[in-house]
């Protein structure tokens, strides 16, 4: 389940207006709804990932769940520590997405904040998965790396394109629709 959720999360980069191949395939509102739905599903499963690592220990008889949890949070393994940090970033991303209209009056500021958090999240969690991925073969890890690289390119293109477009509109003396308070 975590493999599917991680893949869904990385694919969120491709369910944005920055990914030009999808833009012409349907109305943007449908793409945003799919982005939101897949985001909630993947975040929902991944927030329970630590519990799913610890709880089965109850039935194995070797180590108790609390001892397993304590071992995880007191480790010095950088990949596990980045997994914990990624969990906190993911929780922040989820909460700010749900409370977006209360926290941000300007849609562009929220979108930029959301994009930066998403890149931080995927970088941190990507390292965690590539180093610790028990269920991933070398081919699967290569697939993840390609998806991550494509996601980064999509984000860079989106924000570079937005900067160019904003400059073009400013030169014409016009205001972008995204600069208004409504999304």
Curated annotation (Swiss-Prot):
Superkingdom of this protein's organism: Archaea
Membrane topology recorded in Swiss-Prot or TrEMBL: Multi-pass membrane protein
Keyword field contains Transmembrane: yes
Major subcellular site: membrane
TM region positions: 37-59, 79-98, 110-132, 142-161
Subcellular location as annotated: Cell membrane
GO cellular component: plasma membrane
Entry keywords, A to Z: Cell membrane, Membrane, Transmembrane, Transmembrane helix
InterPro entries in UniProt: Fe3_Rdtase_TM_dom
Alphabetized Pfam families for the sequence: Ferric_reduct
Key word Cell membrane present: yes
Name listed for the protein in its UniProt record: Uncharacterized protein AF_1462
